[in-house]
């Protein structure tokens, strides 16, 4: 009788535990796919969304000059980190202006909230954040100092994945949060710079071609261990497939490099600054900005 009682307890404990796990996973995936299919996203006009975002812009320009090549920068899933400020200084020192876009702050997301919801894929997926990209690009005429022939996009991790999603957008596949998307209003993008993106199942580039074959440079990390989200092999397979007919994506697999290898400032365990890889990326980026040209955007 005693053993029977113990087995009954074990059986029902297992059923309850399994049910809880099922409910938790069901809740998670329902939120992920609700975002994917635009079921839980507030939709706005691009000009209103630009005004919503711009109060959190970090703009850095060179001291001398009137018009500058400009890099529009999109941070990783946890929000802006100081290493992006270092990149802005680097750009400025090389005669390049930059706008660092904060996608978390205007939405009221703290660092902890962003890590919990955005990094997990529950909130602000790439096709929604692509609306941030569109809203900014279509309102750059407010800045007279931008050289409109030399606009570049740059993204880190979630920001890189966002830019890849944005490149798939057209009048039939629009950002999930924009009411008035029109691809003819997207200005010429001279090039795209991305670091350690998510190239897996939620990345729209897995299913849809890019709107234009905009020249792109990508830096991957061979020791990237940010879960399954940023496996470099996913990106290598995807980029090789995209480059089959015409090569327009150059990627580099950085040796002895972790996720966010370009941050001198400590972020978390498992992320290590690699100066050699960062310097390599800097040299490639400057060369890319000076020589790149979009073929059909």
Enumerate the language-model features and the residues they cover.
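Hydrophobic residues in well-ordered beta-strands that form the structural core
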Residues: 100, 155, 218-220
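C-terminal catalytic histidine-bearing segment of alpha/beta-hydrolase fold enzymes
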Residues: 246-297
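Serine-hydrolase catalytic machinery in alpha/beta-hydrolase-like enzymes
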Residues: 48-58, 66-146, 263-267
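The feature captures the conserved acid-bearing segment of alpha/beta-hydrolase catalytic domains
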Residues: 178-245, 250
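Solvent-exposed loop/turn segments at secondary-structure junctions
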Residues: 76-80, 104-108, 157-160, 197-202, ...
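Primarily recognizes the serine-hydrolase "nucleophile elbow" in alpha/beta-hydrolase
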Residues: 128-211
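N-terminal Sec-pathway targeting helices
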Residues: 2-21
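N-terminal cap/lid segment of alpha/beta-hydrolase-fold proteins
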Residues: 24-66
